[in-house]
């Protein structure tokens, strides 16, 4: 008489029932399901951390913004800047210079309301791809806020404060006024603040007297004024000019032929020595 070995019975914790031991496919399915649940849990926790961090920086940034406008109210910003000696109004700026600045610094300047999600997303993609985290996505309005209301230190709370200020500035002023304030307060290197000082200091001219090549090279300096100053690094200033020209072509403010002609003029530019 043969003995039949009884089938092994186990308790399945997944189905919560008794039965034969799970096979290989069942085990793999259980492992994959566990890993999927673990991944979803990690992603959910990461999302919660991001939301909490975003909320923290938004609240902290708004406090910084409120503190800044106690010192310099938004509604007094234009009168404060436009009353300065050497202020250059929009009507006295060459169109080539205006086009060059917008192309180089904020190509969507006329379309956004102070903060540009498209530029921020594009800058983030560039930063992640290069690993440099050099692109900030700041609009001209945000740069104006940074230069007039805040310190130059870089941290997320200050970036949030800058955004709050930019939105408030856009509600208070039109685009021409914002552009005026921006170009009259930015630093051009060699001790020159504002387009009026820069045009006079580098070329001995008023902004309207600038040639197109001179206007374009000045538009590129504020990106890194100490590095691009024509007095100390004329070659770098010309290289930066080429970047601006390429962006003007990309924004359809110049044809490639016009840009090449201006680039050829760069080698003939005469800069006044630093005073």
Each language-model region and where it sits:
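Juxtamembrane regions of bacterial inner-membrane/periplasmic proteins
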Residues: 3-275
């Amino acid at each position: 008489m043969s003995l039949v070995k009884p089938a092994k019975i186990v308790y399945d914790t997944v189905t919560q029932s008794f039965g034969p031991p799970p096979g290989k496919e069942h085990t793999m399915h259980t492992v994959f399901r566990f890993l999927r649940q673990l991944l979803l849990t990690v992603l959910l926790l990461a999302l919660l951390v991001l939301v909490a961090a975003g909320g923290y920086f938004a609240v902290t940034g708004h406090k910084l913004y409120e503190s800044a406008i106690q010192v310099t109210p938004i509604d007094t910003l234009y009168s404060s800047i436009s009353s300065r000696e050497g202020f250059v109004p929009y009507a006295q700026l060459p169109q080539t210079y205006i086009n060059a600045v917008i192309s180089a610094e904020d190509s969507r300047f006329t379309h956004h309301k102070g903060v540009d999600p498209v530029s921020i997303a594009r800058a983030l993609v560039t930063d992640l791809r290069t690993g440099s985290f050099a692109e900030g996505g700041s609009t001209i309005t945000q740069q104006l806020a940074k230069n007039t209301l805040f310190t130059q230190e870089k941290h997320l709370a200050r970036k949030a404060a800058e955004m709050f200020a930019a939105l408030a500035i856009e509600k208070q002023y039109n685009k021409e006024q914002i552009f005026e304030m921006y170009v009259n307060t930015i630093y051009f290197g060699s001790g020159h603040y504002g387009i009026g000082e820069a045009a006079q200091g580098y070329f001995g001219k008023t902004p309207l007297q600038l040639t197109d090549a001179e206007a374009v090279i000045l538009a590129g300096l504020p990106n890194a004024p100490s590095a691009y100053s024509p007095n100390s690094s004329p070659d770098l200033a010309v290289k930066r000019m080429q970047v601006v020209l390429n962006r003007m072509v990309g924004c359809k403010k110049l044809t490639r032929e016009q840009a090449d002609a201006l680039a050829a003029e760069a080698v003939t530019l005469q800069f006044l020595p630093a005073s």
